[in-house]
């Protein structure tokens, strides 16, 4: 089974992936950040490195999806291949940071890949406001993220909302501003109840009965 977590930069995808993997005994697949050879250069010069970075992510994510499809384990994935192609690449193109030629090439490659894979069994989308994202980004202190532009985050957020409206697979939406799933066990419990209901048809026990 394939569970995927989606959300803007700083939404808490990696944290929720780790917590749910531990809670359910699922196998986590994390976003390839630490060993990414393009990420630091990209945040220093987005226009120069946007295509290289997006192709790198697309390659890694496609390999992940193929491996997940072959696995007998339940895998929870930190970010999806759809976010790369439906959110990040179009946002860069609209901002003038990816050329028409590169964007067309990238989109053709993604469409070919999508003819070979299926949607996750469940998508968990973390919806977060820009101030909340900025707070998380500053708190985790990755040097290359400190130069992220607010208009870049805002553009991503708008594209996420457009994508979610048209997403065709099973999905739950988590309010990232109101659910502190890292430090508040009750918030994490509420999320797991949503997952149980969607995946297994289970409903939370009513403690008043």
Question: Where are each of the predicted segments found?
Answer:
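Conserved substrate/cofactor phosphate-moiety recognition/catalytic segment
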Residues: 22-60
